[in-house]
Amino acid sequence: MKLFTDETLLEIYNFLEQELANTSTLSFLANNPDTNPNALSIKSWADLAEIFKCKLQTPKIAGNQIEITFKKLNQDNSFHNANISDKTEKYGVDSLFFNIDKNNHPYFLHSFIQALKLANVAKREHILNLGINKADEFKLIKELLSQEEFSQLKLTGIDHSKTAIEYAKKQFPHPNTTFITQDINKLRELNLPKQDLIISIGTMQSPSINYKPLLMQLVQEHLKQNSAIILGFPNSRWIENTLIYGAKTKNYNFSEMGILLNDIIFAKKYLQQKKYKVFISGREYLFLTAYRQ
């Protein structure tokens, strides 16, 4: 079994790249960072596993060494590759996506909590979520607020998946929550009241959405004068329910962020023109949070 002692990170990287090209599981020994302050940390090994789209197995400790195992993720086991005849149910209850809980990922949870605090969610009476799916965002809001604060809100969730909406209704049978099956491109047909806060996580970049016109429509027609908006931009992929940093692009085998950053910059500039104060944060999901007073 390979033993790493004083190799450089580049040497380790090259070894992993070569070996993982021909095997799905790779084990090796390395210095124990608990006993050797110069050894690579467990976080560094976890980062390397993610780079090579592997899952880091729990290391085995053997005195001054640890045994590390990388297990390749099955990249075909991803909702991104799902072949579904009914496009409205790509994210429905029978989809791979439906089993994902973004709120259980530490960086997503941390970034979303910060965005909700910036938006002062407790004071936003009318809240609209576009692409609500099974209502994970409403679940977090409910957990963050007191029962009295949550009961004062009027929350509306919209999704084109009928099965997801039916599931969300069962999870939130509260009188202050409404769930609607609708194509977001046809939002005007619902004649909704203007909102204090709009949230959309990973929906605005869908191929079926005309992003820039829809964003302008939301600001001009669906937000109140003193309002807030939270947009979540995926900078990652889900493989086997594991969140892997970096969104895949069609023509490259690495993450190319040009389109993502272009969308964020457009939103930032447009919202600033409309006198919103804008913040950008996050990692695997980049959050744009804006509010206007």
Q: What are these language model-derived features?
A:
Residues 1-86:
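N-terminal accessory interaction module
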Residues 206-218:
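A short, conserved alpha-helix within the catalytic core of class I
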Residues 161-162:
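Conserved SAM/SAH-binding beta-strand->alpha-helix loop
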Residues 242-268:
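Conserved Class I S-adenosyl-L-methionine
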Residues 59-122:
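Class I SAM-dependent methyltransferase Rossmann-like catalytic core
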Residues 134-150:
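Conserved SAM-binding loop of SAM-dependent methyltransferases across substrates and taxa
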Residues 189-198:
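A short acidic, Gly/Pro-enriched loop at the edge of an enzyme's catalytic core
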Residues 226-235:
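Conserved beta-strand signature within the Rossmann-like core of class I S-adenosyl-L-methionine
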